[in-house]
Amino acid sequence: MADLAKLVDDLSSLTVLEAAELAKMLEEKWGVSAAAAVAVAAGPAAGGAAAPAVEEKTEFTVVLAGAGDKKIEVIKEVRAITGLGLKEAKDLVEGAPKPVKESVAKDEAEKIKAQLEKAGAKVELK
């Protein structure tokens, strides 16, 4: 149990960038994605009230589909948006399609998409 307590202390002392890098390393090591889980609401019972109106999606994932011809400009924009280092941003751009930002508001996602497209990238919102 002492090892677990030490692990909790070590994880608590990580900076945000270090925690993001740790999450990325664990995703690669375990072959999983840290995308937010989506809860599924149960439908109305038979003979019940009409189904509620479809809710508008509030969280988006900005996915870099391709770097296009201006790869260096796209890498610069990815660095500015994510705060990643040069190597990490380059790896993300070269490994496209990859998520750039996850669980962001619609207006922020559209802003990021516009920035990346201005730099020459192909971007999708999911």
From Swiss-Prot:
Source organism, top-level taxon: Bacteria
Cellular component, GO, one term: cytosolic large ribosomal subunit
GO biological process, one term: translation
Keywords tagged on the record: Ribonucleoprotein, Ribosomal protein
Molecular-function annotations in GO: mRNA binding; structural constituent of ribosome
Assembly information from the UniProt record: Homodimer. Part of the ribosomal stalk of the 50S ribosomal subunit. Forms a multimeric L10(L12)X complex, where L10 forms an elongated spine to which 2 to 4 L12 dimers bind in a sequential fashion. Binds GTP-bound translation factors.
PANTHER family cross-referenced by the UniProt entry: 39S RIBOSOMAL PROTEIN L12, LARGE RIBOSOMAL SUBUNIT PROTEIN BL12M
Annotated function: Forms part of the ribosomal stalk which helps the ribosome interact with GTP-bound translation factors. Is thus essential for accurate translation.
Protein name: Large ribosomal subunit protein bL12
Origin species: Methylobacterium nodulans (strain LMG 21967 / CNCM I-2342 / ORS 2060)
